[in-house]
Amino acid sequence: MTAERKLIVLDVDSTLTQDEGIDLLARYVSDEAAREVSNITALAMAGKLDFAASLTARVQALAGLSLDDVVSATAHVRLSVGAETLVHSAQAAGHLVAAVSGGFHEMIDPLAAALGLDMHRANRLEARDGLLTGKINGPIIDAQAKRTSLREWAAQHDIAPANTVAVGDGGNDVLMLSAAGVGIAYMAKEITRAAADVIIDTPDLSLVLDEIGVPRV
């Protein structure tokens, strides 16, 4: 890659973070719901289920959870090793770092603010009277939406497609990785690895810097 300005777009669940946010939320419903949601998540990330349909089914299981439960679950989200180094080093070199997720703004907004991400996009949980309805508010952020976000942000900031980098682990990241100048599969499922230009199998997100020639700070 060149020394020109880059756009790095990260998946969130199991990439920027070590956890699947919806699985953390499901634990506040019941052990049975947590197992069911976790199983559906695993199949969706392996590309064996349609993401939008699987997300709709999983979110339905969250109906009745309070927004306070969402805040509590968010407190348990763990950043991936090397996440802060990746973001801060890339930005120090003049690049942009964004995140796009099939997860939820309610959980990702605090992380994006803490990391100082340049842009982020995710689904929104519908709530009424402080309780989740079990529905998504607005269009679903799926594989196509992730690819669109990468292209849209690059165009907005006059960054050539060849200077875009996408990092993800699951089946719904494949289109985004394929559209990027460099697609990086991070601790990824087989379907994602097959679509990637670079594969990182060590749980350290800062290794992305080495692959794109950006020094650590």
Predicted regions and their residues:
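C-terminal cap/substrate-recognition subdomain and adjoining C-terminal extension
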Residues: 74-217
